[in-house]
Structures are given as C-alpha cells and as structure tokens.
Amino acid sequence: FDVADMDGDTAKELLVLNKTTENAAASAAMYRQEGGVVNLVGKLDLRTGFSEFSQVLYGKRPGETDGIFIDGISGTATLQTEVLCVKDGTLAYVLADADTVSKTARSAGYLSMDLMGNGEIVIPVQEPFPGYAADASEQVRMTRFLGVSGSALKEVGRGYFSLNDGCIFLLPLSWYGSVTAVTDTLTGDIKFCRYDGEIHD
C-alpha cells in the first residue's frame, strides 16, 4: 500500500494494491478518510496480471492530476506498467487499453523513473540497436523512454541503459537510425559506431 495526495487537494489518500490470485485479478483500490471514517472511493482491475509489485511512482501530467505509475511483474520475469489517475474523485485508467499497457513490457529491473528530474515519469523499454536481428544472441539493446501523452505512450528519448553499471547514455536525435552500438570483444565496453545498413565498428 501507499499513502499520498493523489487528487491534488492536499489531503492524503490510501492506495492498496492486490496481486493476481487464482480467484481474482490484480487490482488497485483507493481509500479516503471522510468524517473520521475511511471509505473506499475507487477500485480498478489492473490490465497486467501482476503477480508481484515493484514500485509506485507519481508523475506530473500537465493540466491533470498526477499519474500513478504502478510497476509490477507479469509472468516469469516481465515488468509492465499500469498508469492510473484520480478523475471525478475516483480511480481511472490513463492508458487507453490493454494493448497500450502491453507496450510497456520489458525485462525485470528496468523500473519507471523521473529521467530528466522534471517530475514526469518515463517507462524504459528495450529493443535491439540497428543492425541486430531480434533473436541475435549477442545483440546490444537500445532503451526507448516512453512518456504518457493523453491516453497514449510517446517516445521522449533513446539511449543505452546499463543496469549492471548503473548508467544511462542518451542518444542525440541526429544519431537515430544512423548510429548503433557494439560490444568490444577485448574489454567488454560498449562502443557506438556508424550504421548505414551495415555496422561499421
């Protein structure tokens, strides 16, 4: 559970998360204290099948109440993010549908974050850098940082994100599609190089 001001009225609400069980879908419920009594004011099934939760973050949405970003594990080791908000006093979905939510799927460990320090949360998803087949065993993976725009996901940046080293390198826009990355076979370091349909390392 978590306690925070979820609707921007300065009073704090209680968010309770329940993971998927044999008899019930994963869900989020919001409670508010009114007149000395704690009341349930909203509950939604999460469109992810979360078997466990990783974190909850709150992110700015211009002109709207904050988004509630819920990271959790679906299946064996797939991390996904459901985004909720408070609308008309109750919980509401931010992302349009389950298909949009599924686009947040990535490897465990790549948690949502405030990448730029501006209060806006982004979701890091991975794909191979240009020049690698999707099933290549030695591919270097690029991270696409997805922000929320209305009820859709919008790419706000690309980069190389190493969980092991704890570092993120953001790619300049001019590199998109023309630069890829390779692993130095001697040092294990990541190197960036020109890509024009072939990898020039």
Give the location of each predicted region:
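Loop/turn-rich, solvent-exposed surfaces of beta-rich toroidal or solenoidal domains
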Residues: 53-54, 62-82
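Conserved blade-ending motifs and adjacent loop-strand segments that build the rim/top face
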Residues: 93-113
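Secretory pathway targeting signatures of secreted, lumenal, and periplasmic proteins
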Residues: 172-201
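Acidic/hydrophobic-patterned starts of short beta strands in beta-sheet-rich repeat architectures
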Residues: 8-18, 61-72, 114-127
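N-terminal "mature-domain start" segment
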Residues: 157-179
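Beta-propeller fold detector
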Residues: 39-46, 93-99, 154-159
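Beta-propeller blade termini
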Residues: 1-6, 52-62, 107-117, 124
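Structural motif
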Residues: 22-31, 75-87, 129-149
